[in-house]
Amino acid sequence: MRKILINHFNKAIYLYVLIGFGMSHAGSYDDFFKAIQIDDVRTIQQLLARGFDANTLNPQGQHGLLIAIKEPSLKVAQLLVSAPKVDLNILSASGESPLMLAALKGELDLAEKMVKKGADINKTGWTPLHYADSNGHVGIIKLLLENHAYIDAESPNGTTPLMMASLYGSPQAVKLLIDEGADPSLKNQQGLTALEFARRGSRPDAIELLSKTTRIKQADGKW
């Protein structure tokens, strides 16, 4: 009888510990994603110090670092990038990496940290350089090129960073790419060059830069 009681007692203790752990984990999970939304660095620091996984996904399958950059919750994003085992090459459902989002938003400090930690600069398809050029973030464009970003990287439909800069970016971004050797003669799957992108976007500065480059190359016999 005594042995039976001891067994029941041990099972009860085990269930109590198991339930307590589950409740604690659920609380930590909720706290983690709430802290990301409000840029609460202190809570994130405490959770990571207790062993919470920085790569935990929310119910929609979104990685905490991607959420932090999108919010933006930049203090939390900086902290998560510094976490020892964080996955810097995690992709969103639409194929965007943390570095791509930082490039799109012009977050140079964050991008520098990720590049130093080995974030993928030349991922297949759309790249961080495409994203930086689409908003004309010259500082990030320079950072990526200095770290061997492929200047004529092609998206799934053949669009290059120069095409994105010509349509959406700044004249400074277009000039930088041309000066660094981007090829204005390339065409995407629709047969459009960077110059035609600029014309479609009614971008007079980009049109002038690209037209001048085209004339020079044709005169030199390079095309």
Task: Set out the residue ranges of the language-model regions.
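Ankyrin-repeat-protein effector appendages
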Residues: R2, S24-D31, N147, E180, ...
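Ankyrin repeat structural motif
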Residues: D40-L48, S73-S82, E107-V115, H137-E146, ...
